[in-house]
Amino acid sequence: MRPFERVRTALAMWLARPVGVEARKVYWQRLAGGFVERYLSGPHILDIGYRGGNAQAVPIVPHAIGVDLDYPGYDGTRLPFADLSQDALFVSHCLEHIHDYRGSLADWYRVLNIGGYLLIFVPHKWLYERRAAPPSALNRDHKRFYTPGSLLAEIEESLPVNGFRVRHLADNDYAYDYERPIDRHPRGSYEIELVVQKIARPSYSHRLELPVGGPKDAKT
């Protein structure tokens, strides 16, 4: 899409779609900058936890299916969708509320097509919580605090070895007020952005999972 056409399309979508509160903060930038086009243009998209407590919220793109806890067949961990059926999953400010993060991450990976994208956004520990460890003073339902490193650690812990690639990882502090007192709710964006792409695991991948002290011919 040409830059002018992208901006025009982005403006129309930005005006028409009341997406979730956190996603809304940088929705225009992601639309106009090509982020949405790059990662969410496939025909089969899921927006997990899209309402975020706002009953009027809509999924991130018009053709996405919004999945919340009341979605038929969804138990909060396992999605009622077939293996290899989705081109992308958009998960904004949801993972930190999930106790069984391993189960959820593994299931999100399960439904992705080869080449599909898992987009995860979580509050940044030092931008949102601004404290070292739980409990959160701002949202008691937050099970864990995140830095980019700890988020990647959960991904590596939960997904198959050599079955994914990290395509994007960044701190999003757009319009963040660094001078706001620590006892006040932060303003602006305060999240970590992560995009993981599912790949076909190379034939040698099973050898990478062998424990230390395994067969002598195992190579890493």
Regions found by a protein language model. Name each.
Residues 33-34, 38-128, 194-196:
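Conserved SAM-binding loop
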Residues 2-4, 17-24, 44-48, 121, ...:
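Short low-complexity stretches enriched in small and charged residues
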Residues 20, 93-96, 143, 184:
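Conserved aromatic-histidine-acidic binding/catalytic patches
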Residues 38-40, 102-109, 113, 117-220:
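S-adenosyl-L-methionine-dependent methyltransferase catalytic module, highlighting the catalytic core
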Residues 24-27, 41-46, 98-99, 171-176:
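A short linear-motif detector with a strong N-terminal bias
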